[in-house]
């Protein structure tokens, strides 16, 4: 009993580890992540094919930009410049850098050996950082703690892992989202499964700490005026999403046991409403 109380009284940051992104990615084959569980809920067959390496994850420029913004906002300029190459090869016809989705840019980035972003993207990351730092509530959530902290634990009978954007020592989980229009955050949260993602984070962190963390999201617009908003996800909605996550994990166990991976569209569906 004393050990439980001692565990619950320690800051959340005591339970997260610093780990390179490549190391975390390499463990996806044997540890369940929130992203993988969301994918399984939507399409078990696609989940399985990706797990077997039959479908390669597409590394789109937008993903790199998102990671760059997270790094700049949460980990600072020095780490940002260490992890990302800034600039690009010049197109002799235009005198400007090749676009990030071009073959020339990809070859240049591959030769450098680390993710590359344009100067315009680097400038955008600076503007996003300033916007977040000027928001009092957002700043209070990331004033202390650890960025990109990893936690692993057995959850619902499966080895699981999470990588938290920011862990506050007392308040817990802080997730950073970039968005085109802040007014549509709630809609985007539903479309992209943010609640289920964060419920999974909360459950795995609670598994090792013995207490449930608070869950906040900082969302920042990627265009003028770079508005910033902070949302605290309620216990009720996280509990509901957690129950759906647990049900999905049980379905995942059945799929593994039977080696049966449906698409979810095997039966006739009814279309009986007007949009």
Region spans (language model):
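Metal-dependent nuclease catalytic regions and adjoining charged, substrate-binding loops involved
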Residues: 2-13, 188-190, 200-275
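Short, well-structured alpha-helical interface segments that form or flank functional binding sites
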Residues: 64, 161, 193-196, 200, ...
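Conserved catalytic cores of phosphodiester-cleaving nucleases, focusing on short active-site segments
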Residues: 147, 162-187, 201
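Secondary-structure boundary elements
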Residues: 137-143, 168-173, 206-213
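Metal-dependent nuclease catalytic cores that hydrolyze phosphodiester bonds in DNA/RNA
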Residues: 1-161, 263-272
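Short histidine-centered catalytic/ligand-binding loop motif
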Residues: 54-58, 110-117, 183-193, 234-236
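Coil-to-beta-strand transition motifs
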Residues: 157-161, 168-171, 212, 224-226
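Hydrophobic/aromatic-lined pockets within catalytic cores
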Residues: 73-74, 78, 178-181, 206-209, ...
């Amino acid at each position: 009993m004393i050990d439980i109380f001692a565990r619950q009284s320690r800051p959340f940051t005591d339970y997260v580890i610093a780990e390179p992104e490549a190391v975390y990615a390499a463990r996806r084959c044997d540890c369940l992540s929130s992203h993988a569980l969301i994918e399984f809920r939507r399409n078990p067959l696609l989940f399985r094919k990706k797990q077997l390496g039959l479908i390669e994850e597409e590394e789109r420029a937008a993903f790199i930009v998102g990671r760059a913004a997270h790094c700049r906002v949460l980990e600072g300029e020095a780490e940002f410049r260490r992890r990302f190459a800034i600039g690009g090869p010049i197109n002799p016809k235009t005198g400007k850098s090749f676009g990030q989705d071009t073959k020339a840019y990809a070859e240049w980035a591959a030769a450098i050996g680390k993710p590359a972003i344009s100067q315009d993207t680097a400038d955008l990351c600076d503007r996003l950082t300033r916007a977040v730092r000027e928001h009092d509530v957002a700043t209070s959530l990331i004033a202390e703690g650890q960025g990109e902290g990893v936690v692993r634990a057995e959850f619902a009978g499966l080895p699981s892992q999470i990588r938290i954007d920011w862990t506050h020592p007392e308040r817990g989980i802080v997730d950073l989202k970039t968005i085109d229009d802040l007014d549509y955050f709630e809609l985007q949260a539903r479309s992209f499964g943010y609640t289920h993602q964060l419920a999974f984070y909360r459950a795995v962190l609670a598994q090792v700490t013995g207490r449930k963390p608070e869950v906040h999201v900082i969302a920042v617009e990627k265009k003028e005026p770079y508005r910033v908003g902070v949302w605290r996800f309620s216990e009720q909605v996280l509990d509901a999403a957690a129950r759906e996550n647990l049900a999905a994990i049980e379905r995942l166990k059945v799929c593994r046991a039977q080696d049966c991976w449906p698409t979810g569209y095997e039966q006739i569906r009814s279309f009986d409403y007007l949009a």
